[in-house]
């Protein structure tokens, strides 16, 4: 499972947002991203990229950067719980956009999130 592979327990206050604008207006999606970033939520983005939507993830992360430190952890999980699963953990200032594709989930930490021993951690209120 992704948690056991390096993500740790990242969820405390979280939001799950699709970046697909096929059925939802892009401006509404960006509004949701902004509201969740402002609320300091851990944000999971899915459907981040397609052949036609190559810049949606960058645009969403640019908004999140307005509210988060450059060292905020970010995880990209490709093919979660499927054959060929792979993941990368980095920070908002070191995003590997080439790793991302349609079947990638992108998780952005909140102000309490950090990376320790290669693990992405968002504490739930007690000391680890």
Q: Which sequence ranges carry the predicted segments?
A:
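Single conserved hydrophobic/aromatic residue that forms the stacking wall/gate
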Residues: 1-7, 11
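Short, surface-exposed amphipathic charged segments that create phosphate/polyanion-binding patches used
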Residues: 8-9, 30-33, 87-94
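A polyampholytic, Gly/Pro-enriched intrinsically disordered region
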Residues: 9-19, 93-102
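Anionic-ligand binding region
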Residues: 13-37, 52-61
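A contiguous loop/helix-start segment that scaffolds small-molecule binding in enzyme catalytic cores
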Residues: 39-128
């Amino acid at each position: 499972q992704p948690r056991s592979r390096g993500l740790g327990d990242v969820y405390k206050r979280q939001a799950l947002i699709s970046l697909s604008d096929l059925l939802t207006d892009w401006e509404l999606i960006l509004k949701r991203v902004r509201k969740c970033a402002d609320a300091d939520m851990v944000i999971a983005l899915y459907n981040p990229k397609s052949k036609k939507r190559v810049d949606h993830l960058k645009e969403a992360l640019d908004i999140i950067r307005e509210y988060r430190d450059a060292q905020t952890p970010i995880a990209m999980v490709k093919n979660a719980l499927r054959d060929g699963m792979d993941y990368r953990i980095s920070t908002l200032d070191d995003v590997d956009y080439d790793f991302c594709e349609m079947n990638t989930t992108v998780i952005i930490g909140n102000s309490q999130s950090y990376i320790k021993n290669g693990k992405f951690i968002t504490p739930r209120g007690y000391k680890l």
